């Protein structure tokens, strides 16, 4: 009998998520880059306990319709690559379709997005869809990530102190803000603007 087995999808997704999402700054980076790729010129990042408790990113980008909002949480689903030749002309920060599914499998995510005056709410916890409905929302996208690594305790123990997590996020936001001077960034931790 073979000792090598194919992992079930949930376990494989949790392991894969650990490659994309290592700490709080990884989540902030992926969400901010999605906002930039969506054409945002105003991005707000709100943290609770340096991102250890909650990360919320609000943008004024193009938003998503209901179909795209749910597809965004499927692995390898992307609006940025359609064919192999596109790999030679990547003009976006993200393109693999890995970030949102990876974040959603190790946390709880609430996405509110509006496109063409139609707003959608997606609620996912541990990779399981809990809610997919219409809602009231402002234009653009608001995504809230909480309970980070709640179901992967091995990863949870590798998170740094709140001070270290915050320092990494501040460093990333400073660098991305310098790279995109036409975008207004706002970073708030525990109601204190940084």
Please provide the spans of the model-predicted regions.
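N-terminal phosphate-binding caps/lids of nucleotide- and nucleic-acid-binding domains
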Residues: 2-194
